[in-house]
Design a protein with these regions (language model features):
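Helical hinge/lid and interdomain linker segments adjacent to catalytic or ligand-binding clefts
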Residues: 56-70, 75-79, 83-85, 209-299, ...
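Glycine-rich, aromatic-lined ligand/substrate-binding cores of catalytic
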Residues: 301-499
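Aromatic-Pro/Gly-enriched surface loop or interdomain linker
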Residues: 29-45, 49-55, 99-249
Length: 499
């Protein structure tokens, strides 16, 4: 993943901004003039500004640009216009041959808009999956593409990722028709699973990580397009905005929305969202795998530190049995005493994949409804035992859940890290964190370290603990925390069920 294809590659010096802020564009290309187009993407595309005549010189790609950044000089700067609408801004740099690449900017409103909810774009997750320069927090994706054994490629994942580099285009700006991460059709007896659109995959050869993050053609894009088409106007911010020193991002909002795949949270983000809900705010999560990994930003918020399950081994902030509040690992790690379910109500540790590869490969793709009288289902014409979303399918990819016990035929929250005792479970479906160990079709979903996950989720890293990871549930639920309320749809795929 380098700029040897002759395209003009670039990155902005910030990804969150408001009207009046100045953005510097750092770029390298084959030489010659380029133009930058800034488009606001929602139900419609709106050109906010176009800047022609940008001279872009050729600069080397340094070694370890994935971790250390490119260090290219600024080629151009612009000021976010006072008339730019809040939202996701696609930045496209185009050279005189028509070759182009994309980056992005999240434009906040100049001031909170009365009566609007705030949608927080999951940009920490975008950065964690970005493999421009070679590696991301999952693998060395370039080495994987060149034929390195998948396990060896995963061992070359990096725990520090620079924001000061371009984005892998298959991740950030995929070709039209990018498929969902779900088995759209049920496999027959003895058949291989068909994850997504095989013809599209064969034509475009995406990496294993391209479908897991980003805005365009994914969950947030679909949600925003639906909301705007139906008359719902939103304000926008992004994960990175929580790193603004002294910032109070959520003040003056009554509702915060998270959509799709908000997987990586810093302490600053968690602190503000905890305070927001405790103070009476409403948090609506239309996503899955939410707040799973604890991360931090360093170097003036230019470097994302995400050691993930290797935090105890590789993170210099980790002290034996007493990591400071900025150390990285699972939010559910007992050393932090702050599992994500205390805020979200659910955890991916107790959920998993549904209808993806061999994880619940013949699942219904739907929630079975147990509490049709819940306020979230008012006017839905759903009844006990009905399936919600089977025709979509609503469930796929990643789903959050909780341990479950039954009382008088109704699911109740069982014992789990941070799971609220007053959690109201609306619907459930089976989910699994790992593909079956006796799976004859080969591995499709790259596994995390199951021993670490089992030890944290179930207190044991032996085969019994690991087996429990494969008996999870996707859960749709709500609960009250402090003076606020939390609704959690429990699946990354919720936006695909909107009609």
């Amino acid at each position: 993943m380098a700029s040897t294809d002759g395209s003009p590659w670039f990155y902005p010096d910030r990804v969150g901004a408001a009207p009046g802020d100045t953005i510097s564009i750092h770029a390298s290309g084959p030489g010659g003039p380029c133009r930058l187009i800034a488009r606001r993407i929602g139900a419609e595309e709106t050109v906010c500004a176009e800047y022609p005549g940008i001279e872009v010189a050729t600069h080397p790609i340094p070694e370890h640009a994935d971790a250390l950044g490119c260090g290219w000089p600024a080629a151009f700067s612009f000021t976010v216009g006072e008339d730019w609408p809040t939202g996701y801004i696609d930045l496209e740099l185009i050279d005189e041959t028509g070759s182009s690449t994309h980056h992005f900017l999240c434009c906040r409103p100049a001031a909170p808009t009365t009566g609007r909810a705030l949608l927080v774009l999951s940009t920490n997750t975008y950065h964690s999956y970005n493999y421009w320069g070679g590696a991301n927090s999952y693998a060395n994706v370039d080495d994987l593409a060149e034929g390195l054994d998948p396990a060896a490629a995963r061992n070359r994942a990096i725990g520090k990722l620079s924001r000061m580099r371009p984005f892998a285009q298959g991740l950030l700006a995929p070709p039209p028709g990018a498929p969902r991460l779900v088995n759209l059709t049920l496999r027959g007896p003895g058949e291989l699973v068909i994850p997504g659109d095989v013809d599209w995959i064969l034509e475009h050869a995406p990496s294993a990580y391209d479908g897991s993050a980003g805005f365009l053609q994914k969950w947030e894009h679909r949600f925003v397009a639906w909301a705007e088409a139906n008359g719902y106007e939103l304000d926008f911010a992004c994960d990175h905005d929580f790193e603004i020193p002294g910032g109070r991002l959520l003040d003056d909002y009554g509702t915060v929305l998270l959509v799709g795949h908000s997987e990586y949270w810093s302490k600053h983000q968690r602190d503000q969202l905890d305070e927001f809900v405790d103070g009476g705010g409403n948090l609506a999560i239309f996503g899955g795998n939410t707040a799973y990994w604890k991360v931090r930003w360093e170097d003036d918020a230019r470097t994302l530190v995400a050691h993930k399950w290797k935090g105890e081994l590789d993170d210099e902030r980790w002290a034996a049995d007493d990591p400071d509040s900025e150390a990285t690992h699972l939010w559910s790690h007992p050393a932090f005493d702050r599992p994500e379910a205390q805020l979200t109500g659910l955890s991916f540790l107790y959920g998993g994949y549904h209808r993806l590869a061999m994880c619940v490969s013949r699942g219904s793709g739907a929630y079975t409804i147990y509490r049709p009288d819940h306020w979230a289902l008012e006017g839905s014409d759903l009844y006990y035992g009905d399936l919600l979303g089977a025709g979509v399918p609503l469930l796929g990819y990643e789903n959050d859940g909780c341990p479950i016990r039954f009382e008088h035929g109704l699911p109740q929250p069982g014992d789990g890290l941070g799971i609220p005792r007053d959690l109201q479970i609306i619907g459930i479906a089976p989910a699994a964190l790992l593909e079956p160990p006796d799976n004859p079709y080969g591995e499709i979903i790259p596994p995390e370290n199951p021993e670490v996950l089992a030890a944290i989720a179930h207190g044991r890293a032996d085969p019994t603990g690991i087996e429990r990871l494969n008996r999870g549930h996707a859960v749709m639920a709500s609960f009250g925390r402090g003076d606020g309320q939390v609704f959690n749809a429990g699946t990354t795929e919720w936006a695909h069920g909107l009609a």
